[in-house]
């Protein structure tokens, strides 16, 4: 049965709350996959000879064996903190920017071309990522620390607060934004793929009578957006992860140097390291997020995304 089309304009505060809550649920459910992706992307980082290939299941088995099941959630707290800033800014930013374009062109939002939606989504993602980059840095560092623990070494940080403090002390305020360039490049590509594709695909599915505005339409749209955003963003994600994991003794001078060295020492395929776990995370993450967000909006009496 088609959901009722509620048209009440939602207060910005309500939309921020719903987006944050949906993101927290999605992040908690899919975080072990994100950890697997990060460990795979760091595998072979800085090695001139490359390293033997290791698959997603091998990484998960190694983490569970050496760090226990709790090791699969290493870095969850900064990840949730990040999403309290990142997701509301990009989601509400996308809706508001799209609304401005619609009002200026006296058009309706569903008729906007995909290219326009893609640019709006990318720009919203850039703004959100600049704000959330310090929390993203801490998340990556804490996820990478698990490798030290598995080798019997002491981790660099005991928690997110200590991580923030140590980074500030040793690398300065600018250190919190280390890797921000590949970070925003990835954010632009991810949100260009996710927001625009989800928005466009959902309305296409509904308009073509493939499904009504329900969980089936949301699932189809989230699968398509997950594939699009993963394909576009994976190379930038690899570079971002390696740049952000660097401490004071940097292996890479900048994101371009990281890109060149990765291809030189590990081959072009290394730019898509972690593609499967990235997609395996983005797919479920987007499914959980969008289904939750659409449901929360419906319960709050707000029109669908």
Swiss-Prot record:
Description of what induces expression: By high light.
Pfam families reported for this sequence: Mito_carr
Annotated GO MF terms: transmembrane transporter activity
Cellular location(s): Mitochondrion inner membrane
Top-level taxon in the UniProt lineage: Eukaryota
Keywords of the record: Membrane, Mitochondrion, Mitochondrion inner membrane, Repeat, Stress response, Transmembrane, Transmembrane helix, Transport
Membrane association type: Multi-pass membrane protein
Solcar repeats: 14-100, 112-204, 213-299
UniProt xrefs under PROSITE patterns: SOLCAR
Residues passing through the membrane, by range: 16-36, 69-89, 118-138, 178-198, 219-239, 272-292
An annotated GO cellular component: mitochondrial inner membrane
Primary location recorded for the protein, binned into one broad class: mitochondrion
Record's keyword annotation contains Transport: yes
Function: PUMPS are mitochondrial transporter proteins that create proton leaks across the inner mitochondrial membrane, thus uncoupling oxidative phosphorylation. This leads to a decrease in the efficiency of oxidative phosphorylation and an increase in heat production. May be involved in protecting plant cells against oxidative stress damage.
Record PANTHER family: MITOCHONDRIAL DICARBOXYLATE CARRIER-RELATED
Protein family according to the UniProt entry: Belongs to the mitochondrial carrier (TC 2.A.29) family.
Protein's name in the database: Mitochondrial uncoupling protein 3
Native organism taxonomy: Eukaryota, Viridiplantae, Streptophyta, Embryophyta, Tracheophyta
Gene coding for it: PUMP3
């Amino acid at each position: 049965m088609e959901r009722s089309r509620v048209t009440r304009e939602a207060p910005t505060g309500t939309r921020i709350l719903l987006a944050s809550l949906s993101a927290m649920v999605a992040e908690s459910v899919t975080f072990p996959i994100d950890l697997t992706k990060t460990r795979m992307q760091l595998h072979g980082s800085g090695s001139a000879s490359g390293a033997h290939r290791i698959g997603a299941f091998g990484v998960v088995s190694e983490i569970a064996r050496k760090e226990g099941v709790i090791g699969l959630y290493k870095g969850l707290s900064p990840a949730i903190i990040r999403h309290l800033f990142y997701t509301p800014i990009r989601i509400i930013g996308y809706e508001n920017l799209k609304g401005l374009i619609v009002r200026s062109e006296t058009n309706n939002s569903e008729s906007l071309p995909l290219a326009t939606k893609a640019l709006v989504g990318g720009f919203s993602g850039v703004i959100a990522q600049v704000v959330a980059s310090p929390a993203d840095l801490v998340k990556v560092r804490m996820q990478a620390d698990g490798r030290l623990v598995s080798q019997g070494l002491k981790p660099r940080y005991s928690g997110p607060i200590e991580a923030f403090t140590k980074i500030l002390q040793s690398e300065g305020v600018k250190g919190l934004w280390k890797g921000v360039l590949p970070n925003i490049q990835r954010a632009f590509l991810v949100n260009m793929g996710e927001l625009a594709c989800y928005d466009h695909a959902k309305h296409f599915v509904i308009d073509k009578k493939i499904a009504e505005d329900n969980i089936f339409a949301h699932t189809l749209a989230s699968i398509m957006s997950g594939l699009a955003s993963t394909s576009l963003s994976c190379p930038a994600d690899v570079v971002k992860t390696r740049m952000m994991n660097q401490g004071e003794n940097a292996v890479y001078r900048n994101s371009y140097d990281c890109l060149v060295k990765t291809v030189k020492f590990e081959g072009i395929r290394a730019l898509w390291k972690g593609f499967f776990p990235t997609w395996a995370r983005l797919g479920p993450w987007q499914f959980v997020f969008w289904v939750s967000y659409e449901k929360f909006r419906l319960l709050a009496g707000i029109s669908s995304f």
